From Swiss-Prot:
The gene is FLXL4. The keyword Coiled coil applies. Interacts with FRI. Residues 1-42 are annotated as: Disordered. Residues 15-26 have a biased composition (Low complexity). Disruption phenotype: Early flowering. The keyword Coiled coil applies. Involved in FLC activation and flowering time control, but has no transcriptional activation activity. Probably part of the FRI-C complex, but is not redundant with FLX. This is Protein FLX-like 4.
Length: 238
């Protein structure tokens, strides 16, 4: 039951009691009048009835004052509650705006991190191909090493043949020309061998550099994944 309902109920009870008291007084008054016609008794009874009415009026006035005070208190409480409700509504709106901003910031951070991961994954998407190329380079290096050994063996045989030809054809012009030809061939073969050796070393250096880049890219991806996990945990906590 609200304050106003309680106040109205109390007022109604008091009014009913007053009316009941008035009814009883009137009944006693009629009984008194019927029992005696003495003017003195009539005057005393009128004075007593006047006092009763004045007391009733005073009680009702006090009740009205009390009800007015209660109404003023209720009005003040209503105004205070309305102001508190307004302040609470503003705080709720502020909290909602803060939550939306926080969610937007987390979404932007997560999206940026995902884009970085996508770029890094694109850089290492051909990781297996690069590894196969490195393996092929190692195989090529071994092949070149075998060819080098074969070439060295051929050069050695050529030198033996050259010496043999020189010994057999010292007096012949043709032997001299063949010797010059074999020397030129030997120099050419040596030059080719040195060029192939140099090219192979450069290629191996490039492949090693690519391996280092792959390792760095893998570490960067692991770091970015850790950052995404941390950002998601913070979004859930918020």
């Amino acid at each position: 039951m609200s304050s106003r309902e309680r106040i109205g109920s109390n007022h109604h009870s008091r009014v009913s009691q007053g009316m009941s008291t008035s009814g009883s007084s009137s009944s006693r008054h009629h009984d008194t009048i019927s029992s005696t016609s003495d003017p003195r008794h009539l005057r005393d009874h009128q004075i007593s009835l006047s006092d009763i009415l004045e007391n009733k009026i005073a009680v009702q006035a006090a009740e009205i004052d009390r009800l007015s005070n209660d109404n003023r208190k209720l009005a003040s409480s209503y105004v205070a509650l309305k102001e508190d409700l307004t302040v609470a509504d503003r705080e709720v709106q502020g909290l909602r705006a803060h939550i939306r901003k926080t969610e937007t910031d987390h979404e932007i951070q997560i999206r940026s991190t995902l884009e970085k991961i996508a770029k890094m994954e694109g850089m290492v998407k051909n990781r297996e191909n690069i590894r196969r190329e490195v393996q092929s380079a190692h195989i090529e290096a071994h092949r070149l090493a075998r060819e080098r050994e074969e070439l060295a063996s051929k050069v050695k045989l050529g030198m033996k043949d050259l010496k043999k030809v020189c010994l057999e054809a010292e007096s012949l012009e043709a032997s001299s020309q063949e010797l010059e030809r074999l020397k030129e061939e030997h120099q050419r073969l040596r030059k080719e061998f040195e060029e192939e050796k140099s090219g192979n070393v450069e290629k191996l250096a490039q492949l090693k550099g690519m391996e280092r880049k792959i390792i760095g890219a893998v570490k960067a991806i692991e770091k970015l994944r850790s950052e995404i996990s941390t950002a998601r945990n913070k979004a859930v906590e918020n």
